[in-house]
Design a protein with these regions (language model features):
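Histidine-centered active-site loop/cap adjacent to the catalytic His
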Residues: 20, 112, 130-168
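Serine-esterase "nucleophile elbow" of acetyl-processing enzymes
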Residues: 1-13, 18-32, 163
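Charged helix-capping and loop-helix junction motifs
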Residues: 51-60, 97, 101
Length: 168
């Protein structure tokens, strides 16, 4: 376990942001969480889904959270390693993936969020290979980085007033 508080990981490998929206009611609501850590969009953006579509999905998840008294906490989207994705899955990565991720992360940074990405990219903005053998799903070293970022920010998240989640 990488976090200093109890969590349930609802991630599904291969999920798009649209799929995350579709399974919200079934997967999230039974747990009645106070907070929801949200890291979605990598698979969508890798495939070239427009940033605006992923942002719309993030907004929908935020609305669903707030309507059920759940505080959404967005996590910034890590970089990708297209060569490793190609080798692991024989799948291409959209040529403009970096600008797509940058656009979605710019939106995320306007919300209650935790930046989990510092130190993940090499000098070219590519996900460091030791963090994810397949180029997209973080292995234990990458998960430890995410855990440390969340743990370091969590006290500040808990201290936020309710109004922090109402602003768009």
């Amino acid at each position: 376990n990488y976090l200093m508080f109890p969590t349930v990981n609802l991630a599904q490998s291969g999920d798009t942001s649209e799929m995350a929206v579709e399974r919200f009611d079934k997967d999230v609501l039974p747990f009645q969480p106070s907070y929801l850590l949200i890291l979605i969009g990598s698979n969508s953006l890798r495939a070239g889904v427009p940033a605006e579509d992923v942002i719309a999905d993030l907004k929908t998840i935020k609305e669903k959270c707030l309507s059920h008294h759940i505080r959404p906490v967005f996590l910034t989207i890590p970089p990708l390693n297209p060569a490793h994705i190609k080798r692991a899955f024989d799948e291409p990565t959209a040529e403009n993936w970096q600008s797509l991720i940058a656009a979605v992360n710019a939106y995320i940074r306007t919300q209650v969020h935790i930046d989990i990405t510092p130190g993940m990219a090499d000098s070219h903005g590519i996900l460091r290979p030791e963090l994810a053998v397949d180029g997209i799903h973080l292995d234990p070293p990458g998960k430890k980085m995410i855990g440390a970022a969340i743990n370091n920010a969590w006290k500040g998240i808990l201290a936020l007033p309710d109004t922090a989640w109402q602003e768009d």
